[in-house]
UniProtKB/Swiss-Prot annotation:
Belongs to the complex I 49 kDa subunit family. This is NAD(P)H-quinone oxidoreductase subunit H, chloroplastic. Keywords: Chloroplast, Membrane, NAD, NADP, Plastid, Plastoquinone, Quinone, Thylakoid, Translocase, Transport. The keyword Transmembrane does not apply. NDH shuttles electrons from NAD(P)H:plastoquinone, via FMN and iron-sulfur (Fe-S) centers, to quinones in the photosynthetic chain and possibly in a chloroplast respiratory chain. The immediate electron acceptor for the enzyme in this species is believed to be plastoquinone. Couples the redox reaction to proton translocation, and thus conserves the redox energy in a proton gradient. It holds the Pfam family Complex1_49kDa. It catalyses: a plastoquinone + NADH + (n+1) H(+)(in) = a plastoquinol + NAD(+) + n H(+)(out); a plastoquinone + NADPH + (n+1) H(+)(in) = a plastoquinol + NADP(+) + n H(+)(out). NDH is composed of at least 16 different subunits, 5 of which are encoded in the nucleus. It is a peripheral membrane protein. Its EC number is 7.1.1.-.
Length: 393
């Protein structure tokens, strides 16, 4: 970090890595001239665990529990990107029912991630009351996850060729009830937060990013859409069954922290629309493509054969990753989550490069906070929405 040469006395302040507003183990070395930010240097790597190297020494089904530790608040998306790559390499068809259930889980995970962004974001800028309301709705989403997958977090629900299990009895009605309830709560958020004059003073005109600047920095997700660029991979790539549903891309023109807040708030309403359509049009059929499982078993095993005794046990998939290169991506809550995958005719990937949206979006932070006040760092960092698990990997 270059220290500016001026006649004034500058103060260097360490924010983090143990700071409640850093959203993880992020450290910022901030140079201050009074209350004005002169320079800011993010220090990363406190949560680095070598996730890419671990992937090169695991079969895909073995690696699935690891990927939920990237963005641990939106684990369905990390699971989706992990199974989408091998499915495309192996030309594996996902049953329509499984695809619809995947969409439902992805959008519920998007809502949970946005809720867990909104609550601490409001607390960062001094509004404690909405935090408790928001976490109440988040618990309902986690109850749905627990009923369907058995886990509130780290679900391990996606499988190559489908999902781990079908939806339990009564889950669809419970989810539809939540959708109706949540739409009324979003209206309450708008009354409580959006029109609050103190909130508007803290976020309006703070951390402005232009559309061209956002593209040049490689930003994605709400960061890009809040700068006037209506770019959403669910519309662009049409992965899973998103092209079968009616919904709109949410975007704003202002490019400030308020615009990023509005994009995420409106996205939750669009997610509810997608979930309702998927639940009402949920097709029948299998929830998993069993051909994706590489069985190597005799057609007529003998009665006392060791293999025959354990025929009811599901073996792990043993298919090979073909020798090709592939880049797959999904629209995660924080932006474009991508994987560059290289296979080499073995069960393990030769290269597994992760493109985390939080890491890319965080790079613009030093530019945004310069010439701003110290208190605005919390607002700007909160509006970016980062999780250090995926930033450091």
């Amino acid at each position: 970090m270059k220290r500016p040469v001026t006649g004034k006395d500058l103060m260097i302040v360490n924010m983090g890595p143990h700071h409640p507003s850093m959203h993880g183990v992020l450290r910022l070395i901030v140079t201050l001239d009074g209350e004005d930010v002169v320079d800011c240097e993010p220090i990363l790597g406190y949560l680095h665990r070598g996730m890419e190297k671990i992937a090169e020494n695991r079969a895909i089904i073995q690696y699935l529990p690891y990927v939920t530790r990237w963005d641990y608040l939106a684990t369905m998306f990390t699971e989706a990107i992990t199974v989408n790559g091998p499915e495309q390499l192996g030309n594996i068809q996902v049953p329509k029912r499984a695809s619809y259930i995947r969409v439902i889980m992805l959008e519920l995970s998007r809502i949970a991630s946005h809720l867990l962004w909104l609550g601490p974001f409001m607390a960062d800028i001094g509004a404690q009351t909405p935090f408790f309301y928001i976490f109440r709705e988040r618990e309902f989403v986690y109850d749905l996850f627990e009923a369907a997958t058995g886990m509130r977090m780290m679900h391990n629900f996606f499988r190559i060729g489908g999902i781990a299990a079908d939806l339990p009895y009564g889950w669809i009605d419970k989810c539809l009830d939540f959708c109706d309830y949540f739409l009324t709560e979003v209206v309450e958020y708008q009354k409580l937060i959006t029109r609050n004059p103190i909130f508007l003073e803290r976020v309006e005109g703070v951390g402005i990013i232009g559309g061209e600047e956002a593209i040049n920095w490689g930003l994605s997700g709400p960061m890009l859409r809040a700068s006037g660029i209506p770019w959403d991979l669910r519309k662009v790539d049409r992965y899973e069954s998103y092209d079968e549903f009616e919904w709109d891309i949410q975007w704003q023109k202002q490019g400030d922290s308020l615009a990023r807040y509005l994009v995420r708030l409106n996205e939750m309403t669009e997610s509810i629309k997608i979930i309702q359509q998927a639940l009402e049009g949920l097709p029948g059929g299998p929830y998993e493509n069993l051909e994706s499982r590489g069985f190597d078993r005799k057609r007529n095993p003998e009665w006392n054969d060791f293999e025959y005794r354990f025929i009811s046990k599901k073996p792990s998939p043993t298919f090979e990753l073909s020798k090709q290169e592939l880049y797959v991506r999904v629209e995660a809550p924080k932006g474009e989550l991508g994987i560059f995958l290289i296979g080499d005719q073995s069960g393990f990937p030769w290269r597994w490069k992760i493109r985390p949206p939080g890491f890319i979006n965080l790079q613009i932070l030093p530019e945004l906070v310069k010439r701003m006040k110290l208190a605005d760092i919390m607002t700007i960092l909160g509006s970016i929405d980062i999780i250090m698990g995926e930033v450091d990997r």
